[in-house]
Amino acid sequence: MSTLKKPNLSDPKLRAKLSKGMGHNYYGEPAWPNDLLYIFPVVILGTIACVVGLAVLDPAFLGDKANPFATPLEILPEWYLYPVFQILRVVPNKLLGIALQTLIPLGLILIPFIENVNKFSNPFRRPVAMAFFLFGTALTIYLGIGACLPIDKSLTLGLF
């Protein structure tokens, strides 16, 4: 069964619509040029209008205004470097901190050799890779949250 609707070209109403350039969405005309040239720009401009409207109506501020005469107590890196910053901050020896960070790519490189499974198999049936992924995700979130706290509360996240 075809998913396209076949046009009845003997219908005079359809012929009148087609002569005016109407009716192309009813019988399965390809997306080019009608949808790509007319519908997509309308959706793109509508999305841009929504984003600009929301930005004008409710601007999001990045934080406190910069004051060059007041240095914060602890200078934090960008948010995506929080876990790395936490490792370097907590480990007493900086060389050990760098060595711990080199273990991350080495561990990722070793996963295919540890778990020899067909690459087309279901990823949820790969227990070693799933365990690495879940442990790494939990550790990254834990280290990222800990980096935002003072050093004495960073390992316990202030819970204990």
Curated annotation (Swiss-Prot):
According to its record, what are the GO cellular component terms? plasma membrane-derived thylakoid membrane
Q: Mind giving the lineage of the organism this protein is from?
A: Bacteria, Bacillati, Cyanobacteriota, Cyanophyceae, Synechococcales
Q: Write one Gene Ontology MF term.
A: ubiquinol-cytochrome-c reductase activity
- Keywords in alphabetical order: Electron transport, Membrane, Photosynthesis, Thylakoid, Transmembrane, Transmembrane helix, Transport
The job of this chain, per UniProt, is described as: Component of the cytochrome b6-f complex, which mediates electron transfer between photosystem II (PSII) and photosystem I (PSI), cyclic electron flow around PSI, and state transitions.
The principal localisation class reads membrane
Give the protein's recorded name.
Answer: Cytochrome b6-f complex subunit 4
Membrane topology designation:
Multi-pass membrane protein
Q: Which residues cross the membrane?
A: 36-56, 95-115, 131-151
- State where the protein is found: Cellular thylakoid membrane
One biological process term from GO is: photosynthetic electron transport chain
The entry assigns this protein to a family as follows: Belongs to the cytochrome b family. PetD subfamily.
Q: How does it assemble?
A: The 4 large subunits of the cytochrome b6-f complex are cytochrome b6, subunit IV (17 kDa polypeptide, PetD), cytochrome f and the Rieske protein, while the 4 small subunits are PetG, PetL, PetM and PetN. The complex functions as a dimer.
